[in-house]
Amino acid sequence: MKVIASTLRKGNVVDKDGKLYVILTAENIHPGKGTPVTQLDMRRITDGVKISERYRTTEQVERAFVEDRDHTFLYQDGEGYHFMNPESYEQIAVPADVVGDAAPYLQEGMTVTLSTHNGVPLTIELPQRMTFEIVETEPVTKGQTASSSYKPALLSNGVKTSVPPHVSTGTRVVIMTADGSYVERAKD
């Protein structure tokens, strides 16, 4: 289906010259002089080659039909990351390059949205927020409760993040999966 270039977002899949590309970043640029353009950074699905394209914001681009379905993460092995469709119990192996930065956040039994095109996995989408325990951080410093400074911390999944000074080792915290940033203490 043809769509206007300015409506494309990260994660969309476009068909360019008969090849499928997943959009990594999409930015609408409005220069002071001249016509506005949409800058797209894309990765070719077949071989992982990254390209950059510019389209006029009103230009038509062919968007590929992609099926988004919830899948349950099962396990990881030499073949990749294995997910199961909870409706049909069908299993699918997703290569590590498709999982990408989401790998440390995957937990057995968690539900993710898996995008496929003709049965080929393209992208996975994690829940926006997840809860983890802090396994290592500096000790709590008294008197720094009102300060806006942050200290480094290591989460139970191996990801490093920054947390406020009042958070200590063993505390469960909510993290944004998009960038690994601290949101709040877990309320559980």
From Swiss-Prot:
Pathway: Protein biosynthesis; polypeptide chain elongation
Keyword hit for Cytoplasm: yes
One annotated GO biological process: peptide biosynthetic process
A cellular-component GO term for this protein: cytoplasm
Annotated signal peptide: none
UniProt-listed SMART domains: EFP, Elong-fact-P_C
Role this protein plays: Involved in peptide bond synthesis. Stimulates efficient translation and peptide-bond synthesis on native or reconstituted 70S ribosomes in vitro. Probably functions indirectly by altering the affinity of the ribosome for aminoacyl-tRNA, thus increasing their reactivity as acceptors for peptidyl transferase.
Compartment annotation: Cytoplasm
GO molecular function, one term: translation elongation factor activity
Superkingdom: Bacteria
Gene: efp
Keyword terms: Cytoplasm, Elongation factor, Protein biosynthesis
Family indicated by similarity: Belongs to the elongation factor P family.
Principal location: cytoplasm
Protein name, per record: Elongation factor P
SUPFAM superfamilies for this protein: Nucleic acid-binding proteins (SSF50249), Translation proteins SH3-like domain (SSF50104)
Taxonomic source organism: Methylorubrum extorquens (strain CM4 / NCIMB 13688)
Pfam families listed in its UniProt record: EFP, EFP_N, Elong-fact-P_C
